[in-house]
Amino acid sequence: HVIECYNVPDIDMNKHDGGLPHMAGVYTYQVRRSCRADGDYTYNHAPMLTGFNNRLLLSYISGKKDEHGAPDEVVYTTSKDGITWEKERTMFPYMLADTKAYIGPDKELLPEHAKMIVHSRMCFYQASNGRMLATTFYGFSPDFHRAPNNGFGAARLVREVYNDFTLSDIFVIKYNTAGGFTKDTTHFYKPEDDSPVNIPYYDEVADEGFVSACSELLSKKLILEQWYEEEMYDKEHYVHGRALSFYTAKDGSIVG
């Protein structure tokens, strides 16, 4: 929402809005309220909002308690008016992954099948054929102070959001090869019983429209710059920069 920032003495960093006065006529609606006493996940962060099929579509990271702490997952919800929202559903679940290929710091702190931490600054992409894709990245946090977006995570995953807001199966859209992970070394597991989770590369599916949408996304270099942090050692595809936001001006130039 819009915040008036003129002649303000101090900002209260303990408040989400800085304690600044809101503009008249602005309303704020809460999508989710969590209560730790009920066992609910209270770390809810990184909202990604788009419009699709006449509804608002929102995804965000939801974790048990802390940033970069497991278990966490990406969930999503929809709304017709931005006021009333559906109960959140899992988009990208909490998983484990094989750490043999991990080449980052503090490897000795990781078990063979380590808890994955989701991290992403870009989720939704609607391709020219109308397909709506959702993505996130799965990384590792060997300890609480080691972020999963340090370039040594495993892979970015993708799935399609259908017109009825159900989801396709999960696929890999990009392995973090610069960080040590390839198709042959990237293996996911269920946390409840350590059983394998089959997540193929996106081009192995028979759905040509989905494959085309994923390939189109991978061809959009400017959009892929939003993936930089998680794959920062892939110098072939990325320039140095963090959390890129951009828009197209009236003259066609890109402002970032």
Regions found by a protein language model. Name each.
Residues 1-42, 51-117, 126-256:
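Beta-rich carbohydrate-recognition and catalytic domains
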